[in-house]
């Protein structure tokens, strides 16, 4: 119990995991750094086509890897008439700082502000969260109205997900970061698309179905 309590964020956030690194980049992008008010620079990729004509996807990645691990996804999204901004959380992709639930929300808000500063209003932004990023998208989506929200492989909460892997631990007591999406989703007025595969071996599909039912 003591190990899990003190090292839980090392288990939850895995910036050094590397998979899908051999995908060839088939899009043009600018590497930018979004500065937080704590002076942390968040490495990000920006695929800009036409900010006035097309909506902009703001992509929040999952709990492992870096920007290069999302090339396969960006290759597909780039086929659509969309601008795309993908940010890398603090401590990921060489960024400074420590990842926590509160800090990830802050990073996401800074990305929204960055787009706003370039003339993109919230109704032209589509929040796209994958796995851990779905918890961030839900929180940011609860705070404001956006053009849309996409949740790919979402969990109901980190607490419930942790119970699957650590059924013998009192996770509801010891967890610091909870990302309680199931309690937020009814407060979101932005249209939501939920995608969840049957063969997901990390987050069970039933969690996506629970969120769908709760949202409706």
Describe each model-derived feature in a short phrase:
Residues 1-35:
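An N-terminal hydrophobic leader/cap segment in hydrolases
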Residues 36-118, 123, 130, 134-135, ...:
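Membrane-embedded segments
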Residues 73, 181, 190, 204-213:
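Short alpha-helix in the alpha/beta-hydrolase fold that links the catalytic acid
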Residues 114-118, 122-168:
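Primarily recognizes the serine-hydrolase "nucleophile elbow" in alpha/beta-hydrolase
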Residues 170-184, 189-190:
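Active-site nucleophile elbow and catalytic-triad environment of alpha/beta-hydrolase enzymes
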Residues 187-189, 194-200:
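Short beta-strand/loop motif that positions the catalytic acidic residue
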């Amino acid at each position: 119990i003591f190990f899990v309590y003190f090292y839980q964020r090392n288990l939850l956030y895995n910036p050094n995991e590397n998979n899908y690194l051999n995908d060839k980049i088939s899009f043009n992008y600018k590497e930018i750094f979004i500065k937080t008010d704590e002076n942390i620079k968040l490495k990000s990729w920006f695929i800009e086509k036409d900010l006035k004509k097309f909506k902009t996807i703001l992509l929040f990645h999952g709990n492992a890897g870096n920007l290069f691990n999302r090339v396969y996804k960006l290759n597909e999204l780039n086929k659509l008439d969309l601008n795309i901004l993908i940010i890398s959380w603090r401590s990921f992709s060489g960024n400074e700082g420590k990842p926590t639930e509160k800090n990830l929300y802050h990073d996401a808000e800074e990305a929204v502000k960055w787009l706003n500063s370039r003339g993109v209003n919230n109704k032209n932004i589509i929040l796209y969260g994958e796995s851990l990023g779905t918890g961030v998208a839900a929180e940011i989506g609860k705070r404001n109205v956006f053009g849309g929200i996409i949740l790919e492989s979402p969990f109901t909460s980190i607490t419930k997900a942790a119970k699957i892997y650590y059924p013998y631990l009192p996770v509801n007591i010891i967890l610091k970061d909870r990302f309680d999406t199931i309690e937020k989703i009814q407060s979101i007025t932005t249209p939501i698309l939920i995608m969840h595969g049957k063969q997901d071996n990390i987050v069970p599909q039933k969690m996506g179905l629970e969120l769908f039912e709760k949202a409706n």
